[in-house]
Amino acid sequence: MKKAVVLLSGGLDSTTCLALAKSQGFACYALSFSYGQRHSAELCAATRIAKHMDAADHKIVTLDTALFGGSALTDASIEVPEFKESPEIPVTYVPARNTIFLAMALGYAESIGARDIFIGASSVDYSHYPDCRPEFIESFQSLANLATKAGIEGDRFTINAPLQYLSKVQTIQLGTELGVDYGLTVSCYQANEAGEACGQCDSCTFRKRGFKSAGVNDPTRYQKCVHI
């Protein structure tokens, strides 16, 4: 069976990617990261999801938190803002996060003989993160095949971002068709230890709107009820 490394945060998008990779016949090696994120309930969710979806393996890699300063997701002194429409890159941006995660996934993939890496990046319904853009994914794939023994020898890597052009509504519809239990997932930027979402951050807003517009019951446990 062909292998794939799937970046699994424990959120809605990455869980949908895991389900999609499995539906395509991959043995899925889930990879999660502990990098000092305040929403560490995601990692508990990732563990539940990997087990529930029968991943071939699930690794949680601990990174030095000093690598990720200046973000509301890693610095408790920076407040996570409520949702606001804006063209600016928000304070929830984590410096070079997807670059680092994909680099780690690439090394892991080459070591286990996997040539496919899945990431839940989307350029629709997102918060203007530069490392979620199609140009970034394409550039990293080029890098992967220039920087590895496998790539140089013609055994090329593919960076799969199947949600790249899907809205949150379409992602939820896809996941529902694949049988994803979204009640296991945690997307909130500041979920509490019980995994309850704030209902007010960007991630909560996109998620809540997505379920409503998709006509799918929202299984998220919210700390606060807000009208979206």
Swiss-Prot record:
Keyword set includes Ligase: yes
GO biological process: queuosine biosynthetic process
Superkingdom of the organism of origin: Bacteria
Keywords recorded for this protein, A-Z: ATP-binding, Ligase, Metal-binding, Nucleotide-binding, Queuosine biosynthesis, Zinc
Residues the record lists as binding Zn(2+): C188, C198, C201, C204
Annotated pathway: Purine metabolism; 7-cyano-7-deazaguanine biosynthesis
Cofactor(s) recorded in Swiss-Prot or TrEMBL: Zn(2+)
InterPro entries found in the cross-reference section: QueC (IPR018317), Rossmann-like_a/b/a_fold (IPR014729)
Reaction(s) catalysed by this chain's protein: 7-carboxy-7-deazaguanine + NH4(+) + ATP = 7-cyano-7-deazaguanine + ADP + phosphate + H2O + H(+)
Binding site for ATP: L8, S9, G10, G11, L12, D13, S14, T15, T16, C17, L18
Keyword RNA-binding among UniProt keywords: no
Cofactor note: Binds 1 zinc ion per subunit.
Pfam families, per the entry: QueC
Gene3D superfamilies the UniProt entry points to: HUPs
Family: Belongs to the QueC family.
Job description of the protein: Catalyzes the ATP-dependent conversion of 7-carboxy-7-deazaguanine (CDG) to 7-cyano-7-deazaguanine (preQ(0)).
Name of the protein in its database record: 7-cyano-7-deazaguanine synthase
Native species: Legionella pneumophila (strain Corby)
Gene: queC
